[in-house]
């Protein structure tokens, strides 16, 4: 893995994936931002460059007249952060699970299922990346596509390194590993005061990532027959009466058959809000091919669970705190 280091005046910049440094893979990466910076600091120390230090205070910088002075820190500034988690959907279930996720909006972004069915990402309605770039993808496929040939060419097909990577890919396939990843862009970090290493409170990212991982909580409706939507509305507590549920379910049936609604009408807004609580958005065009013939549960059925590293997996050896 390549780490890029650049120096301009007194500005030192390092970019790259620290969880891949000195490793064949990053299926299970570094647990904290501090451990990521620690890897960069180790690299800098080895080549005789100054290491990053934590911010201790913020000071007003220079500004033109009538302009607000920007804040200047006395330590390292974080420009981008990637948060990842692995989920095990079960052997052979990866693509169905990803297809199911592609029916769910996230943070006002629209899902886009890639043509090969191996990944889904979320973009703005104009097709742009906003403050965050979320994606979920088939991890075994990603490693076969981007890592396997490189490792074979570098170490040979008979090498221990190549066969170790094959074992990891087999593990991913046997467990149906899907990767949840969010790339937090610089503007997002600045907007939420998360760019000052040492001063910023990164605990809020736990809630952000938990919300992303819980996208599948509403997916059970995608495996239902439309006749059962009314029952699901009641059991989920969205409505209290069967009559109200049946009325809302009719909107879903009309949507399924291609009906276009007038969202300026109050009753349409009401029924859309109800249906969104169980994972159906009648404001988006119904794509029947995106509805996966499975039931997704946290506890053919997909049982999604935490992906635990096998005992033989080689963990990062550079986990000391920076």
From Swiss-Prot:
Its EC number is 3.1.21.-, 6.5.1.1. It holds the Pfam family G2P_X_C. InterPro entries: G2P_C. GO terms for molecular function: DNA binding; DNA ligase (ATP) activity; endonuclease activity. Isoform G2P plays an essential role in viral DNA replication. Binds the origin of replication and cleaves the dsDNA replicative form I (RFI) and becomes covalently bound to it via phosphotyrosine bond, generating the dsDNA replicative form II (RFII). In turn, viral DNA replication initiates at the 3'-OH of the cleavage site. After one round of rolling circle synthesis, protein G2P is linked to the newly synthesized ssDNA and joins the ends of the displaced strand to generate a circular single-stranded molecule ready to be packed into a virion. Keywords: DNA replication, DNA-binding, Endonuclease, Hydrolase, Ligase, Nuclease. This is Replication-associated protein G2P. It catalyses: ATP + (deoxyribonucleotide)n-3'-hydroxyl + 5'-phospho-(deoxyribonucleotide)m = (deoxyribonucleotide)n+m + AMP + diphosphate. It comes from the Viruses. Coiled coil: none annotated. GO terms for biological process: DNA replication. Belongs to the inovirus G2P protein family. The keyword NAD does not apply. The lineage of its organism: Viruses, Monodnaviria, Loebvirae, Hofneiviricota, Faserviricetes.
